[in-house]
Amino acid sequence: MGEFQRYFQLDKFLQQDFLYPLIFHEYIYALAHDHVLNRFVFVDNFGYDNKSSSLMVKRLITRMSQQNPLLISANDSNKKKXLGHNTNXYSQMISEGFAVIGEIPFSLRLVSSVERKEEIGKSHNLRSIHSLFPFLEDNFVHLNYVSDIQIPYPIHLEIVVQALRSWLKDASSLHLLRFLLYEYQNWNSLITPTPKKLSSIVSKRNQRLFLFLYNSYVCEYESIFVFLCNQFSHLRSTSSETVFERIFFYKKRKALVEVGSKDFPPVRWLFKDPFMHYVRYQGKSILASKGTPLLIEKWKYYLVNFWQCHLYVWSKPVRIHINQLANHSFGFLGYLSSVRLNPSVVRSQMLE
């Protein structure tokens, strides 16, 4: 990993995240094959013990250097063996190597974002949007509506490439990714998975590549929620340090509303609802909020327009179901959650 960091620590005018040259290094495929380095990835590399070797990697690299093996003619497509090995094994090795390479700048990007947060200051109660238990432990009495959102899916494989293009400036790697996607053509089945489909697809080959692409796609999809949840988190906390932190936070939010109302009047309504909760589970996400029905509808169409215009992801308003917590319950982690109302009895007495 130290060698990878030295590779990316270049001058600013040279730092373009060129990943394609790394594909021709043998240690990339050694990392993809090593079970020890992948102990934190809950996916097994099936079939690598009998298919990968240093000699096979050298032959693959030599073949890629001398000629382009990705451009297969009609006569070569009928051949099931190449250099004594199955051609599918080459594509599988390249995809696994690309996944290992793609995770390097993606992880460095997350580390840099964490370092920037530490420079700004510690924030104990602005927790991650993926925190399931704070979401379940929070008090929903002050919430009115819940939006059951199905994660939008890309209408074309090129959308997946465009999601990586925003932080990966290597055209050669993007072309290689396009080839791998069209080679297997099972991305659309993975992006909208059911539990049965997901288990059957992940257990097949190239699971590391598709899981990496799915996580990067969802990261782009949740970019708007990262901003909103970091600004308007209202998770329950009891520490005194957090209380002072929340006071300082509401002061900053008040100043932000005043500035935003002057410079950007149309988005003033965006900062009026501090009570927002977001969590993602499998292929859908849940957004709970407090506000009027008109405000919730604005949120709905704002998210749809944001995904379509800025992320080029096709989404329909019907994929966002808005229900009132007082009358409906929402399913999450196999449970149906609802809000129990405590009606107050008012007794009147006539005075003589």
From Swiss-Prot:
Keyword field contains Methyltransferase: no
Record has Chloroplast as a keyword: yes
GO biological process entries: mRNA processing; tRNA processing
Gene Ontology MF terms in the entry: RNA binding
Function per UniProt: Usually encoded in the trnK tRNA gene intron. Probably assists in splicing its own and other chloroplast group II introns.
Gene label: matK
Protein name as it appears in the record: Maturase K
Top-level taxonomic group: Eukaryota
Subcellular location: Plastid, Chloroplast
Keywords on record: Chloroplast, mRNA processing, Plastid, RNA-binding, tRNA processing
InterPro entries for the chain: Maturase_MatK (IPR002866), Maturase_MatK_N (IPR024942)
